[in-house]
């Protein structure tokens, strides 16, 4: 494995050597400090002070050089602008071509500067990690906290690279103007960003900047929300890109998205009528928690076997999912005429056993080419959100009551019959149109954790995932390069083993850092709060306000429809103004306020109080979910980005367990406290979990560095 010091020297840009981070010198200082502290000749505070000063000097050198180079690029753009102005009246084709090439040359210089920043950022992160490991200090937390949050922060100058955006804008505008001299009187500010003609150099700059730090536009925000592994757009060889194109089949992708949509509709279509169904079978209205939650109980187990099954096939698990969901919905609908609560619950359990969301995620991650994977990830999240909104809305429309061949068709049973018909149509469509991708034996072995696989393709992907997106804090991926500093003869076989996906729950758990554990706790908290709100909505609103099924359905549909606009606002605007960790804490506080506002503390409980608190709780939970999964996709080990026990499965399991616990809480509280005390009895655990998650977030705040 290549020694990082040698790699740093090898990758340096000729003429810029003196401005690079002096990793070799600082590594030597760390070794000196280690020996001195062992001998007792150096005090801890003195070591921290000396090393902080050395780091500050090195980072200042990098920042000042970066600003100097940005100034030179800006001066060149100004000169080119004057040349372009002279061509306005007398456009000469040859001079326009030369000017366009000069603009592209500036763009290439900007790419070079971005690579300079990336290499230095990696060096800073690695020396911080090495310092903590050798001396046993938590110096990284102190350094990041004290430097990144300071108003004169030089770290932020590197991480935010605000001037880069201005240069890209100037290049885009001028290249677009030179390219479109005829037939158009619009400039880039009059057009939608997606409609602007892009020069290849702009795409190269964007790809390099995205590798340096994750961009926070709406599309990427939704993609991270799905927690689907994203490949670097510049990563991989042409052969690898060709393999991705060979696997890709548009109709198969649409079928996976349709499966996601239908499953979310299936989950929430019963919420407005679950209490009425329970009472019609002789149970308490609060048994709606058991009716709704039984599907989540089964999903806890189905997510694991579907994730494992997708190692070998995509068609067969989707086929099995469709059949099981078809049968489950038929049982759900027939339970009314059979007068059996057991049949009702078994039907919902069968529906939960058909949850193929792990397969849908995996298909997008493995079989969709990198060029459109982010769009597919965003479509996955959008399909889930629309399904969540359409479920209750559809239930509100099914207001009828008649018999057909001895079967009762009413607002309680129709959700089951409608979904059974939907899954039957989907099953036929799947059988006719789905195309099974060729996984190949090497991919199967690798994803299943087989020791026989020595594929280097995934090693290269792991290397590309290393870098500035991890920022300064240590991660599992750093072990490779750090070991390279000490052992130069590490073999390819051991390297592949290090990069192999987790092969069991136990091995996946060992990869969970404190930051990842807190992120999963936050995910549990927000899903718990949302499930409490949604699952008991029909009981609470019926008891306090006398709402009918139609009103509850509209209320839940409006909440569901808020998902995409909220994500759009956060992903497009708010995340560009604040750090993700700041948004996370603020939205958790807002969620806590929503839960507190929901309590019935006075004699009169108004619909206005309930609606306002519900909207605040739900919207805050959506913001928390998006930002939390965005952060989770950065801080989790690369080994959790693929395989059976991947990050998507872990987050799904955390959310599903939260739903099970929440539905169980509703049922238990209804039996023990009755409908009159149900609201406060279920909100109290949600309040405690929310407080615990905020405390955990603050305790790991510095590990969530953006």
Swiss-Prot record:
Membrane topology: Multi-pass membrane protein
GO cellular component: membrane
InterPro entries linked to this entry: MFS, MFS_dom, MFS_Domain-Containing_Protein, MFS_trans_sf, SPX_dom, SPXM_SPX_plant
TM segment ranges: 251-271, 281-301, 318-338, 340-359, 378-398, 414-434, 520-540, 554-574, 583-603, 611-631, 678-698
Region (Disordered): 475-498
Record-level Gene Ontology MF annotations: transmembrane transporter activity
Keywords: Membrane, Transmembrane, Transmembrane helix
Source taxon at top rank: Eukaryota
Biased composition (Acidic residues): 476-488
Coiled coil: none
CDD domains, alphabetized: SPX-MFS_plant (cd14479)
Primary site of residence: membrane
Location(s) in or outside the cell: Membrane
Boundaries of every SPX domain copy: 2-145
Keyword Cell membrane: no
Protein family per UniProt: Belongs to the major facilitator superfamily.
Descriptive protein name: SPX domain-containing membrane protein OsI_32082
Organism: Oryza sativa subsp. indica
